[in-house]
């Protein structure tokens, strides 16, 4: 099905139930904040936005997150597509899946500090698109995780992983608690969270990235959303989810946060310029940049930003090279 007001909505449907036991996934998670003593390798000063809709784009943009500016051309994806999901080791950007159509199983990679076209990395365990299935890519600097998605219209509970520094095919990691698509993800380097989903929901699941065990319930975000594109990011402790779709023509302007290391701690703490479904998000650990997306007047070229520690109303950062949404997006370098 299609959804999303403004520009054209993304496709995909899911829901239903899946499997998954706790299996010790929480590990060291408690009420004491983020992972301690770890370098947040997956954060960096260069934001990269890949592909998007509509039509299917192969464009890759980049910008310097600490400096207000417009994006520049970085290169091209292997094929134009939308509804992908990205993750980062800080050195290498990975782009999973997407919809051309049909759904794709391909995985591309770029090196953050080397301008150029994407290179083939390998294949996912099956053809899946993200965006309408924004699956949580949750990197610890070495392992990238892809959760849920649709193929082609059925929500999945699969969790795939890759070793970011080594090209090759993805391996099935474990299962989510239910079949889900339309989520957004974030990580503190140890724990990965995936929030929201289709139909609009506020459920949040947790996976320990280093353990091959099933996801467990984390809690809820305040506002039920379908997310699309890489709408989640973090500063290594606080995870942030932007915009989303609530049904009908209801594109949301909410900015919501979670404290990744504290089960159930979340709040609605800011706003985007407009209701926006399909915006993408990245962070350098201090500043969060939100790019593109579908707004009431159509697809946007805007890059907006927040200081993650403060929230509030978004401020103007610059422009991307093409109006689009439902893209891949992360930071490194």
Model-flagged regions — what are they?
Residues 1-333:
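Polar, enzyme-active/binding microenvironments
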